[in-house]
Amino acid sequence: LSLRRQRQMCIRDSYDIYPDKAIERELYVSNTVGADQNNKMKKIGIFLEDMDHVTVDGNNSLFMFHGKMTTFATIGCEDVEFKNFAVDFQVPTVIDMTVESVEGNTATMYIPECYNYEVAGTTIKWYSDVSPYTGQRYWSISDLSGYHTQREDTVQGIKFGAGNGNAALKGVASIEDLGNHRVKITYNSKAGEVQNGMCFQSRPTVRDHAGTFFWKSKDIKMTSLDIQFLHGFGMVGQHSENITMEDVDFEAPKESGRTTAGYADFVQMSGCKGAININNCTFAGPHDDPINIHGTFNTVTSISSDRRTITVQYNHHETAGFPNFFEGDEIEFMTKGNMITVENSVRTVTKVDGPDGMGGNMGEGSGSLTTIKLTLDKAIPADVQVNQHVVENITYTPAVNISNCEFKEVPTRGILVTTRKPIVIENNTFDGMSMAGIYISDDAQGWYESGPVRDVTIRNNTFTRGNAQAIFIEPTNPTVSTEKTVHSNIKIKGNTFFTYNKRVLDAKSVDNLTFKNNKIYRQDPINGDGSLS
């Protein structure tokens, strides 16, 4: 569904949206498939392009998507609101199966009704639904061994991001289809993870689509949405300004028997500016981080003789192909080794030659999806050297407010955020995080997710049943400067921590760190229900 002229779209009831008739575009999205040409084409269900002042009001409708696709997207839009609807997939691309009973070396597994499957000897084949246009299935998988599998203890509400992988289908002697979406698995040797209430969640590892996508857009708002499943890589905001989420709940429907609502991250804001406001939202059942807000470092690979023109490159294989800089943007250089900013290195971009994000070129781009040439207003400092320094677009760094949200059933971190603009994280609950509840990094070694924080307030949050540090501040600087810090001005006040053997705070390379008026309680790990010993 492509919207170009309408200014308001009000709909009601349930709608099936198929990739067969969807808009298709070549797009390059941060943290997904990088320059991979096998996955450059994106199917988009609801697509707004170059439109302003639009409201998409679902009137409590359900949008049921099929196959693999982006649910809704804006490109070059301003003042757009999506509200009052639910999003789900007919057959989610994450396969959930839950242990109902265990007896000796056998286990009975429940497979939710949305999945199509067939027992084949000692394995199970899985199928999508059938296209009404072609009569063909959108996808099928005959063996989950190549999938990434996580586990969720549905009794305790705790998710495990690592361990014995798909233990449910290891050491299998036989599988019997019992009907009614139950299978009986007999094991030669049953793994300890196969126990009552354990849900095994298996997904592909290729992020071929974004779940939703907002690019070169401004003043985007999502209100009262139920995100029951997103295929691919969550809600991605890329080089957009002012994105607001109010009462957006990410959670599989209780009656569905499923436990997974997201293929990877739920919310990924990459290189945005203005304000990112996330309020009164629920994040339950992702396969990666619920919220990740960051910029992107590019490594300096060449410098002209007058030091006014530089070539930079993308470094991680999942990020490439889109413009990370625009004329008029300010940039700043950092040293890769210690992650310290280079003094007096802020410059203004006057020309960009590189990929345009749609398979073409900006300026006199070479056609490379991984390199960008920048012309600057004046020469860069002599300290900046090839392959030793990275550059960040500091124009596209947002202020962030995350408040009154609930994070649960998470296999990774709750919130990742790195931006130099003010950050406020308040009145949230973090339950059972497998890793840190709040993680502040700044990375020019692996993901190249920038940048330093300068003003952070973490207050009045509650952390329970965490399996790691509640708050973790760790830039990935292999060399720690003895003169300067990467981060500064972090205030942690009025929070409540329930823990049994983990740190509530672990910090590195921070100037002016305040930890004040917080309450720390010893939690009973045996009860596992938040009660105290």
Annotate the PLM regions.
Residues V155-R207, S345, K351-V400, K408:
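Small/polar beta-strand repeat architecture
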Residues F65-T71, V91-I95, H209-G211, H231-V236, ...:
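Short glycine/acidic-rich loop motifs that flank beta-strands on beta-rich extracellular proteins
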Residues G157-G257, D265-M269, I276, N280-T282, ...:
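Alpha-solenoid helical-repeat scaffolds
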Residues D52, C77-E81, S217-K221, Q238-T244, ...:
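Short "repeat-start/strand-capping" segments in structured domains, especially the N-termini
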Residues L1-R7, I11:
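Single conserved hydrophobic/aromatic residue that forms the stacking wall/gate
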Residues F65, F89-Q90, C114-I175, A320-G367:
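Ser/Thr/Gly-rich low-complexity blocks that favor extended beta-strand/coil architectures
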Residues R5, D16-T55, M64-K83, V91-T106, ...:
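Extracellular beta-strand-rich solenoid/capping regions of secreted or surface-exposed proteins
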